[in-house]
Amino acid sequence: MTLIRLLACLLFLPCLAQAGAVRLKDLVEFDGVRGNDLVGYGLVVGLNGTGDGLRNAPFTEEIMSNILERLGVNVTGEDFRPKNVAAVFVTAALPPFARVGSQIDITVSAIGDSKSLLGGTLIMTPLNAADGQIYAVAQGTVLAGGASAEGQAASVVQGVPTSGVIPAGARVEREIEFDLGSLTQLRLALREPDFTTAGRIETAVNSAFNGRVAVMRDSGTVELDIAATQARSPAHVIGRIENILVEPERKARVVVDQRSGTIVMGADVRISRVAVSQGSLTLRVEEAPIAVQPNPFADGDTVVVPRTNAEIEQEPGIKLAEVPESASLSDVVAGLNALGVSPRDMIDILKTIKAAGALHAEFVVR
C-alpha cells in the first residue's frame, strides 16, 4: 500500500510543477499570423416601426435610394419615409488564412435614431479593409441583444436593442495574401512583454528542439531560426511549439473600473506600512419656494418667496485602519474591508495609497 501511494505521488508531481504553466500560443502572437478588421455600412429592413426617423437621419434615405437604384428601381424625386428601415455600421474580424467562401461572424450597430434592430434583416453589404478593398459581403437576420417597448407616456428598454450580431453572416470574397512558407525567421511577439517570460520561452523552445533555435531579442520578442529546427515548413514549427507550456511572470497590477466600481488585484500586489482613514461629507441644498398671496379684496400681487433648506451629513464612526509592511493581497482586502467602505470608495483609497508611494504595483484606471 505504501508503494502504491508513493507511485501516485510521483505521478502527480509533474502536474503540480506545471500548475501555473500556460500554452505558448496563449502568450504570444506569431509574426504574420494575424487577422484584419473589416467595416461597411448598409441597411437593416423589416423592422416593426422601430427604424430611423428619416427626418432626423437623412443619410438613411440616401443609402436606401442608392441601393434601390442599383437594383434598377428609379426613386428620383420620390418622397418615401418608411419606418421599417435603419442605417447601420457592420464590423467583422477577418481571421488569418480565411479562404474564399468561408463564413465569418459580424456585428451590426445602428447609426441613426432607430429604436431597435430586433427582427430586422441586413441586406447585402460589402465589407472593406483599411486598404479600401472589399474582402467580404454580409447579409442575414440580425440577432439583437435586447428589447424595447414604448407607449404614449412611458417606454422601457432592456439590454441594447440597437446592436446585434449575425453568426456566419458574411462570406469571404477575397483572401489576404501572405506566404507563410517563405519565412526563414519566425518571430514570437509577447502579448505581455516581460524579460523573464521571454527568457523562459527561449529556454522552453530550445529544450523542445534539443538545440539553440530560439533567441530572445527583447522583452517582447523571441526569434526562431526555421532552418535550425529542421522542420519541413514554418507551419510545422508553429504546430510543434504552440502547445509548449511556459510559466509567465505576472506583474503586480491593480485594475479599477470607475464606472462599475470593479476592482481587480493580482496576487503579487504589495503595500508598505500605511494607515488609512476614510469618511464622507454630504452637503444637501434644496430650494422650495412658496407663493404668498394678498388678503381677499386687498390691493396687492402674488409674490414668490424663496425658501432654502440646507443640511450637512457626515458619516460617524469610521476608524483608522493600518495595513502592515509588505502586505499581501489578503492583507490589503482585509485592511480595506475594515473601513466598511463601498467599492467606489475603495478606488479612491487605492489612488491615494498609490500617490503616497505605498502601493507597489502598476495602477490602471479604466
Swiss-Prot record:
Pfam families in UniProt: FlgI (PF02119)
Subcellular location field: Periplasm; Bacterial flagellum basal body
A Gene Ontology biological process term: bacterial-type flagellum-dependent cell motility
Keyword vocabulary terms for this entry: Bacterial flagellum, Periplasm, Signal
Signal as UniProt keyword: yes
Record-level GO cellular component terms: bacterial-type flagellum basal body, distal rod, P ring; outer membrane-bounded periplasmic space
GO molecular function: structural molecule activity
Keyword Transmembrane: no
Annotated signal sequence range: 1-19
NCBIfam families: PRK05303.1 (NF003676)
Annotated PANTHER family: FLAGELLAR P-RING PERIPLASMIC PROTEIN FLGI, FLAGELLAR P-RING PROTEIN
Family: Belongs to the FlgI family.
Known partners and oligomeric status: The basal body constitutes a major portion of the flagellar organelle and consists of four rings (L,P,S, and M) mounted on a central rod.
Function statement: Assembles around the rod to form the L-ring and probably protects the motor/basal body from shearing forces during rotation.
Protein name per Swiss-Prot or TrEMBL: Flagellar P-ring protein
Organism: Ruegeria pomeroyi (strain ATCC 700808 / DSM 15171 / DSS-3) (Silicibacter pomeroyi)
Encoding gene per record: flgI
